Amino acid sequence: MLRSWEFVLLISCFLCFSSDALQRISLKKMPSIRETLQEMGMKVADVLPSLKHRISYLDEGLHNKTASTILTNFRDTQYYGEISIGTPAQIFKVVFDTGSSNLWVPSRQCSPLYSACVSHNRYDSSESSTYKPKGTKITLTYAQGYIKGFFSQDIVRVADIPIIQFFTEAIALPSIPFIFARFDGVLGMGYPKQAIGGVIPVFDNIMSEKVLSENVFSVYYSRHSESNTGGEIILGGSDPSHYTGDFHYVSTSREGYWHVDLKGVSIENKIVLCHDGCTATIDTGTSFISGPASSISVLMETIGATLSDGDYVIDCKKINLLPDITFHLGDMTYSLSSSTYVLKFSDETECTVAFMAVDIPPPLGPLWLLGATFIKQYYIEFDRQNNRIGFATSF
């Protein structure tokens, strides 16, 4: 039960904006973990040797207290937004992740022995007048370590929308890879089915407050690499100034997940993969595009890329000669040019191809993950109201 003054606080906050207004979250662009390692003269495989050939998902174990969480690019994203937790507000940089459904941030109770904790903003429950303990322990297990913590309840503000939210205070963070991360925590934008511990996800709590004109959110990533203004997430709709033409919608293919049918992957108008269909998810929590190891191997061989220290690379002089790679989603095709899917770091002569092999076992996989490399080219609308994803060409 809310105390009376907490209720008044929430009501007064809700009166600050119209229920049909778009609620905006500014995204900032940061170096990804991969880019941070590059700046330090290190490669991913130097830090995480198991990535040298491919990454394999752990078997899912979605039960109440412990679950295996997909590693992919170890939340190797470049985009974060700010939220606040508590009263007065404590500010956190979080990744808005469509591949998960829980909110976690480092806790003040995290031991100084975990250097990844002390290098980030930490939630201090003793400084919040609206904090309520829950205490249920939770472990999120990664391929290279784990996050341990416990559930707490407090007022979380996202785009100035206040909600009462259960979240995880992380008290154990592995140094690898999180010490290299520029974000503090993760805010899952997935369905309740993915939520560990049976908590209600943040976006579901926002929807229940009836403050949005539509139960959708849209994601825009800026293409302008020279700016640290990374883009925007809009709750309740989309912004026509971010895209051209119309949205084309694809229904989700699996209940409770942002999965869609991928009808093919083609090069030069010839389908080379997924002839009989595959499954893909639009993953805002990762930078690269990933797929089954056997498929990625064929794709990279087709464009002439080779595997080196865990990454697919190609001679930088050949970038302009490479073909478009096209994804068939619904009745539309979505192409990526070589300047989009090939990355050049500093003055290196070998450039990194933004594809990687990730084998996800059944029942969740096999699965393609279309990360920031894809999202930068297409404005994406995630529609919970109709269980579909919309795609439009972004500016």
Swiss-Prot record:
Catalytic activity: Cleavage of Leu-|-Xaa bond in angiotensinogen to generate angiotensin I
Glycan attachment residues as annotated in the record: N64
Enzyme class: hydrolase
Tissue: Expressed by the venom gland (at protein level).
GO molecular function: aspartic-type endopeptidase activity
Presence of the UniProt keyword Secreted in the record: yes
UniProt keyword Signal, yes or no: yes
Functional summary from the UniProt entry: Renin is a highly specific endopeptidase, whose only known function is to generate angiotensin I from angiotensinogen in the plasma, initiating a cascade of reactions that produce an elevation of blood pressure and increased sodium retention by the kidney. This protein is also found in snake venom and shown to specifically cleave human and porcine angiotensinogen into angiotensin I. It does not have general protease activity, no cleavage of alpha or beta casein. May be directly responsible for elevation of blood pressure in the victims of envenomation.
UniProt name for this protein: Renin
Naturally occurring in which organism (per UniProt): Echis ocellatus (Ocellated saw-scaled viper)
Gene behind this protein: Asp-Eoc51
